[in-house]
Amino acid sequence: MAPEAGATLRAPRRLSWAALLLLAALLPVASSAAASVDHPLKPRHVKLLSTKMGLKVTWDPPKDATSRPVEHYNIAYGKSLKSLKYIKVNAETYSFLIEDVEPGVVYFVLLTAENHSGVSRPVYRAESPPGGEWIEIDGFPIKGPGPFNETVTEKEVPNKPLRVRVRSSDDRLSVAWKAPRLSGAKSPRRSRGFLLGYGESGRKMNYVPLTRDERTHEIKKLASESVYVVSLQSMNSQGRSQPVYRAALTKRKISEEDELDVPDDISVRVMSSQSVLVSWVDPVLEKQKKVVASRQYTVRYREKGELARWDYKQIANRRVLIENLIPDTVYEFAVRISQGERDGKWSTSVFQRTPESAPTTAPENLNVWPVNGKPTVVAASWDALPETEGKVKEYILSYAPALKPFGAKSLTYPGDTTSALVDGLQPGERYLFKIRATNRRGLGPHSKAFIVAMPTTSKADVEQNTEDNGKPEKPEPSSPSPRAPASSQHPSVPASPQGRNAKDLLLDLKNKILANGGAPRKPQLRAKKAEELDLQSTEITGEEELGSREDSPMSPSDTQDQKRTLRPPSRHGHSVVAPGRTAVRARMPALPRREGVDKPGFSLATQPRPGAPPSASASPAHHASTQGTSHRPSLPASLNDNDLVDSDEDERAVGSLHPKGAFAQPRPALSPSRQSPSSVLRDRSSVHPGAKPASPARRTPHSGAAEEDSSASAPPSRLSPPHGGSSRLLPTQPHLSSPLSKGGKDGEDAPATNSNAPSRSTMSSSVSSHLSSRTQVSEGAEASDGESHGDGDREDGGRQAEATAQTLRARPASGHFHLLRHKPFAANGRSPSRFSIGRGPRLQPSSSPQSTVPSRAHPRVPSHSDSHPKLSSGIHGDEEDEKPLPATVVNDHVPSSSRQPISRGWEDLRRSPQRGASLHRKEPIPENPKSTGADTHPQGKYSSLASKAQDVQQSTDADTEGHSPKAQPGSTDRHASPARPPAARSQQHPSVPRRMTPGRAPQQQPPPPVATSQHHPGPQSRDAGRSPSQPRLSLTQAGRPRPTSQGRSHSSSDPYTASSRGMLPTALQNQDEDAQGSYDDDSTEVEAQDVRAPAHAARAKEAAASLPKHQQVESPTGAGAGGDHRSQRGHAASPARPSRPGGPQSRARVPSRAAPGKSEPPSKRPLSSKSQQSVSAEDDEEEDAGFFKGGKEDLLSSSVPKWPSSSTPRGGKDADGSLAKEEREPAIALAPRGGSLAPVKRPLPPPPGSSPRASHVPSRLPPRSAATVSPVAGTHPWPQYTTRAPPGHFSTTPMLSLRQRMMHARFRNPLSRQPARPSYRQGYNGRPNVEGKVLPGSNGKPNGQRIINGPQGTKWVVDLDRGLVLNAEGRYLQDSHGNPLRIKLGGDGRTIVDLEGTPVVSPDGLPLFGQGRHGTPLANAQDKPILSLGGKPLVGLEVIKKTTHPPTTTMQPTTTTTPLPTTTTPRPTTATTRRTTTTRRTTTRRPTTTVRTTTRTTTTTTPTPTTPIPTCPPGTLERHDDDGNLIMSSNGIPECYAEEDEFSGLETDTAVPTEEAYVIYDEDYEFETSRPPTTTEPSTTATTPRVIPEEGAISSFPEEEFDLAGRKRFVAPYVTYLNKDPSAPCSLTDALDHFQVDSLDEIIPNDLKKSDLPPQHAPRNITVVAVEGCHSFVIVDWDKATPGDVVTGYLVYSASYEDFIRNKWSTQASSVTHLPIENLKPNTRYYFKVQAQNPHGYGPISPSVSFVTESDNPLLVVRPPGGEPIWIPFAFKHDPSYTDCHGRQYVKRTWYRKFVGVVLCNSLRYKIYLSDNLKDTFYSIGDSWGRGEDHCQFVDSHLDGRTGPQSYVEALPTIQGYYRQYRQEPVRFGNIGFGTPYYYVGWYECGVSIPGKW
């Protein structure tokens, strides 16, 4: 064996020789070459003997010992080659006894000779010391642990085999032996067989039983160049002989085998529906790592089936793209290797189905010709699409007048139709016809345009056309083919009726498109509608026709139609800008998405555009068209953007909607419109009854919209009569419900109409807007076919919109849902550019790309403008009346303006509004008519409010209609409010992106465009106080500046506030206004007020957080839209607000919080984004604290409200310190929730002079950095900062919100908490806490200890007083720096979290720390610490280090002593820490309680900046100089840097050593360096060491901008990225570890008693959390419901882009505020929205947010995701005892003729089983070389996965299962677990999602 081993080493030796010779050649020192030869040869005759004392090694010296002297011998031994111990013996020794060996264990021994020139090659031996007992395993005796049974007589057990020899080759070992002695047949020791074992170590052996006659055996498929131990035993019935061990080294593969290898790992990746990429591994190249030039590969493929013909491709590369395949077909692929003349064997076949795709070609030979004798009819024919394009679902024939491409209409025909008649054309016109096909996967391309000229005729009467439209409905069936009728049943009537209707519609539109006559989509409805509409206006018929047309597509391509419909409204919005077609076009841009889908929408819009009246009618027509297409489209676009034209038209149609008290006039209009819509709806419902019978509720919003659609007057009427609107909505609802049932299109249409009329109208408009915008979008998509411009946008929008609309429709609490959904979608769907183009107000959308909400919110603001307050009030009253009518409200929610902005600002909205929107939802809380704006805004109330708001808004709208934008904004606002997202959005809009809104928005806020775009001129004027450009800003600011002025005026001052605060300022101001008085209460936050009860502390705080979040959100909307919102929110808020401008500002914020409905939004709104949520949690606490402070320093407070909340109340206590403290606190920004305090920290305040906002932001950021800290320490920075703090908070929050929300601390480097932040605790302003008491709500309160049971019976002590987790030995859990991990009570009062907010102990008492969060804590840091979202690793346990505390500092006895290193006075860590921690979360009512760790000068005077300060965009932070002053660029804009930078540079202070017994990371535990109040905290920075973003670090921007495929990762303000080790598999479980477990049961008990209403607000701050490198899942996170709402659960809706445009949503329920969405496809856009529910029903739906998944990892999956392995749901038999997963079960067939079964924990964690047969039992898999990591091969992953739980094979029960040793090895069946070398696990994470299909 030695020679063989030596032989195997020759190759390496040659290599070294070559290297040495090369060196010799290069270095002209010949002697070196000679010297290199002097290393010794290997020792000879090496023997390894087993003795009682151990293992004895003997050897002889090597040859040539004289010429190559040996200086010493090296002996290495161990159980495996990976764990060897080394011993050196001198050259004169030739034997050695190894004593420290375990009996019965196989040891490898390596012997080498060494001298100064080198080492010989090793000689390997293996043997096991005597001892151990024999046990039977797998039917064969195997040596196991335990003493050897010496009593067994040798007479019975056979002797061991003789002369065992092992020969090795590159991948196999040949073993030969002689029979043992005395083994004859008659011998008592005869052998009945042999047991051969082999493996890479003694404990991981594979055993092969052999017959007694065998004398050789070959072990195949081994790894080359590896050392194996081989054991051989003879056995008989009595037992086995002693084993004989040999060690052998497999050789390098050198010579090419005669037989060519078979390719491995063939993978087929779907590239498109017609192409796949086949790749494979060439085993030779893999092993030799060199390319063989003559090697060729042949790929063969065919359709599945034995008779199919093979196609071949030959290539020299190891991958090939195979194209021209047939979609939706299973193909078989195989590969072989060829070299020279030789061909290898074909590999096993791999099967892959090509995905079905949308048609890739258009129908050919489209021919259109006039029908003789019928000047209005043409016949069309086309060729059917080939089968290769998939089964055609329907054909969509689009046509438009050649000179009016925006008036496009579409008719749909069943897939088997190839001809059609189109009626209703204009004689003498030239028409463009195009056709496209659709299948289940989507729309195909358009054919080339075919132009046909209609013969002239005297008959072209619009009325006749209208009648025709009505008639054609009947004739539809008579249209060219029955299909046409079928389609006509749907939106598209048969060709003739539809065409005719379309034409009539066009005419109607041209003549009087009222866009409201949302006639039923169906032809019949149309017929009726035509008449009814005629009564109302022919427009309705037109719309009806459109609707019917669209409808027809709806049934077959309902979604498309809807999309189209959606589009037009957007378009309408734009159109509205000008009466002429241009306006339409402008609108069209909004509609672009939709345009492709629904040309009809376009034509409607276009035709009305021709003249101002037509424009007016057009707007209605648009509505109609949208309505026809989709109720929502028409409403939103036309109204909002049509304000100018539309307003005129509306006024005409509706009376004068805008100028008049929209209420009165619109109402009257409404009644008729209502009637008409009702009838229309009815018609529709009759037409479309079957389509969506279930959508009545959903449709209600539509119905409302439809009613509005029914006539131009309808919108006004809806607006004007609060009751009417509401009533209308309600009545419409019934009708709508039928229409909704019809297909939701009608519903959509109706909303569209509403939108039109109420585009100024409040909610109805808003909702309609949303709907219509949605519809429009979809319409736009269809229309886009006709129109070249904006098609993509439109289509997108349309899809989105449609999805939204449908969702809305589908929602039972449809009113709200529709609106909400529509709104967001509209915003989304709309093409922003179009919106902006559409009209000046369009800017609104730009300002709030989330235009739906923003525009809404803004309008609301304007409508609430000072001039409109009464309106609002009146409205408010009405709203309250209407309140009960959620549907109405919903419709109202979607104002067209809102909608329009939505399209453009949707994304932004989605970001900011989402938060904002969710805030909005809460916003509705305010019911005070007082604040006019607020009233409208209240959408929080939204149903009723919305209705009222709608009325108000309508009047406001009418009012604003004068400034058409204003009216729109008003309605938008209103809508937004009801649709809460919009309001929030709008608010945030003003402040800009929602993320921005919190902190940054303010800066942007100043950009009036936002406001402008948001409000339109009208809104601006409404917001007289705020500048037109700042309408929205003012909104955001309103909360803040409130001190300057109440109402609008406050908005103007608000701008800076808003900016400083981001959206928050507005919220603050509103809060101020809302809750001036309330602010006084210590519960600074509105929440505080509500939640104020200290008893609630944590809960209150949390509630506060949630409320404040909502309120804040709302307030931001309110702030601009002003105080209105806020005031609305706080019924008295508006009055209070004015009174409270100065002082209460921060308070206002609190009040806003306190006033659950009203103030909430303001304070939170800024946070509206997820960040807001995080912030909101923080904010809540902070707001509580900040607000309290705020009372003192209104401005500051307001901006810092949360943070300073304690300051205000506390402020009173602390006098100078209070403010400073509070400001400091703001800096600390205790994060109630997750301990996001650190993250919450605001940047240091800018210099006192700097704007509060700026300062606020910086202050928040600075805490992180020492420099920042220093400003914090400075009085001026803090005070300002305080003022600003909330804004800063917001500003940071925007990004932070989600993360913060996730972990609160996660945002910023959690580790480096605001290092600069003074270590002051609550009581300290750099001095000891005089009060010594902890805030009631503070965590300090949970004094005491809790014992929890850890894994494996371990016990842990949670010491809440000291903030530690200890084990029985007194060792404490430590952080990544070896310091004690600080813990506190979570916001839910049950979860124990670290100061970063990362859960450490679950509410059920389960530990969440340790290795992978499932093991026992470690004594020292792990290699890869688990990081909370804040970035802090959880390390393990360390004995508490006793550090010298500063002599002066003594810790409070209760707390572990954590003297502040610099601080002279130790802070009682307990109270302080706890409090801080808690304070943030809990309401820190007492000023003393909240301590801003950020240093705040005791003397802090809170300057209240009077001018808004620009802030940085979301994702970036302001730069501050050493003094904490904001660094401004030459152009007056603050210098910004990426948010992440903050972690890196600013955290230097973290390096400061901590003198305390434990490092306190929490803000609370700010390093207790006492710094003079005025001193900057720099010296104090002994804060936590700066943390480098580690695994789990959270950021709104991905660490890597590009994914593995080189695509840019999707970035948005509401998107947060977690990073992970690129080599680790994706783990949903790990990602979820970053989320705090929020418990609803804490809120429910009290609230259930209070209310019997369904949730009144939509969830806010929706954030999408993605993990870099993981495309298959995201975690949707959102803010809790407003405190007033009782929420027992949530529904999360998700849809891919294709589903979104079809309004096809998947729904999942969640009991907490986050939910993972799994099995997402790569490179795909998804949409998400959330809805709260309780036992009384469902609340409104949040606006949707979108996210684009990243590319798949091309190196991960063996087969492509598009053609991922087909996992079949199948419940197989298995033993569930040994799995950690108990979810759904899937199976798939594998290439190795086994069935793989998986039981899911989640899509990325599962237990893998194998079986030979589907019906047999499935077994676990064992691994003798590892922990099953390579079993990921069974689920087609190339990755070595992670497995768990970690254990030892001895702890695993012995079970039956499959086992193998290495990847690619065939599995064998036997026992695994204890007593075997085969380890099995309870779960696997392989990075591959199962089932992998979304």
From Swiss-Prot:
Residues 565-574 have a biased composition (Basic residues). Almost absent from healthy skin; especially in epidermal keratinocytes, skin fibroblasts or endothelial cells and is barely detectable in benign melanocytic naevi. Expressed in the stroma close to skin tumors, in the tumor cells themselves and in the epidermis of psoriasis. Induction: By TGFB1 present in the melanoma cell conditioned medium (MCCM). Residues 455-500, 515-1271, 1311-1350, 1444-1515 are annotated as: Disordered. The keyword Iron does not apply. It comes from the Eukaryota. CDD domains: FN3. The modification Phosphoserine is found at S717. Residues 614-625, 711-722, 759-778, 1197-1209, 1445-1504 have a biased composition (Low complexity). It is found in: Secreted. Residues 786-799, 1211-1226 have a biased composition (Basic and acidic residues). Pfam families: fn3, TARSH_C. One of its GO terms (cellular component) is extracellular region. InterPro entries: FN3_dom, FN3_sf, Ig-like_fold, TARSH/FNDC1_C. Glycans are attached at N149, N1661. Residues 1071-1088 have a biased composition (Acidic residues). Residues 39-131, 158-258, 262-357, 362-457, 1658-1752 form the Fibronectin type-III domain. Gene3D superfamilies: Immunoglobulins. Keywords: Glycoprotein, Phosphoprotein, Repeat, Secreted, Signal. Residues 626-641, 941-957, 1027-1060, 1166-1176 have a biased composition (Polar residues). The keyword Repeat applies. May be an activator of G protein signaling. This is Fibronectin type III domain-containing protein 1. The lineage of its organism: Eukaryota, Metazoa, Chordata, Craniata, Vertebrata. The gene is FNDC1.
